[in-house]
Amino acid sequence: MQYRPALSKMKPYVPGEQPPPGKFIKLNTNENPYPPPAPVVSAIQSAATGPLNRYPDPMATSFRRAAANALGLPGPEWVLAGNGSDEILTLLVRGFVGEGESLRLPYPSYILYRTLADIQGANWEQVPFNDPWELPQSFGENREDLKLVLLPNPNSPSGTIVSKPQIAELSNSLNCPLVVDEAYADFAEENCLDLVQSDENIFVTRTLSKSYGLAGIRFGFLVAQPHVIAELTKIKDSYNCDAISIAAATAAMGCQEWLADVVAKMNVTRDRTTDRLRALGFDVTPSHANFVWCRHPEGKHAEIHQYLKQSQILIRYMDFPDWGDGLRISVGTDDQIDACMLMIERAMQSLNISLPARADST
């Protein structure tokens, strides 16, 4: 059997572990630890008893209208709905980057970007962050074969951000579209939605998997100028969003007060997590997302991860060649974070990692 050469050469993207529900404290894939709001649950229940023998709205019109209203956009023609923001990213790579052409991404960041380029038979260029997590000037350099630049903002695994003025300047320096992946933007102090309206080369991708607590339904969207949306609509699957997810996502857009409350609560827990890790001697990168990236001067990150896993707590161990490794810990409930911190301290004791004299696990 003969596959496309690009497929034979590529390595698959490996997502975070998804254990059976209830067996682990799960702090490894940046999900919202709180359930979605009641109106979303009601919308799902109502849609589940609706005419599921019929195809859904191929354009997810109700969601696009609700999103435009919630986000202050001129109209639904500025929004394209997708089966998770990963599908939106797939459409962008498919629409702009041909075989043998290139896309650019920062490093370390979301590894799926490389996979999407590989699927296309395209090239990808990784530009390493300067220490500490700052984009180098070379990230904005043009090249004839460069067709798309992807920038997660906030970034994963670091949780760091590039400011809006920097992004506007970056777009001005490029001759190709700049995709700002705002999967975690609700946890940050600013976003780039207004830049989309003034710059046709800036696109913003969003997901409902993080702040909205809807990772299980798979729904994301693109915000771009209407002519971009119209062109990308040509290459999307005919019915890419199902009726239940459209209903849930539409209802979620009407829950902005709930969103603000849950984000504020998670940000308090995030900052508390940062303080606890620093008290244990970890170097923690200031985060604008729903996770923290930490490294210990004595290392042993893989061993800490394994100790916690054996104790039924999942965090994410990540090792980036030529950059180093570390631990990414999702923001959970306060009780989940308390359990995680206690087990990290026990892991450090077991692994003979130095503990500060006044480290406190309470």
From Swiss-Prot:
Any GO MF annotation of the entry: histidinol-phosphate transaminase activity
InterPro entries to which the protein is assigned, alphabetical: Aminotrans_II_pyridoxalP_BS, Aminotransferase_I/II_large, HisP_aminotrans, PyrdxlP-dep_Trfase, PyrdxlP-dep_Trfase_major, PyrdxlP-dep_Trfase_small
Entry keyword set: Amino-acid biosynthesis, Aminotransferase, Histidine biosynthesis, Pyridoxal phosphate, Transferase
GO terms under biological process: L-histidine biosynthetic process
EC number: 2.6.1.9
Top-level class of the enzyme under EC nomenclature: transferase
Catalytic activity: L-histidinol phosphate + 2-oxoglutarate = 3-(imidazol-4-yl)-2-oxopropyl phosphate + L-glutamate
Similarity comment text for this entry: Belongs to the class-II pyridoxal-phosphate-dependent aminotransferase family. Histidinol-phosphate aminotransferase subfamily.
Protein name per the record: Histidinol-phosphate aminotransferase
Organism: Rhodopirellula baltica (strain DSM 10527 / NCIMB 13988 / SH1)
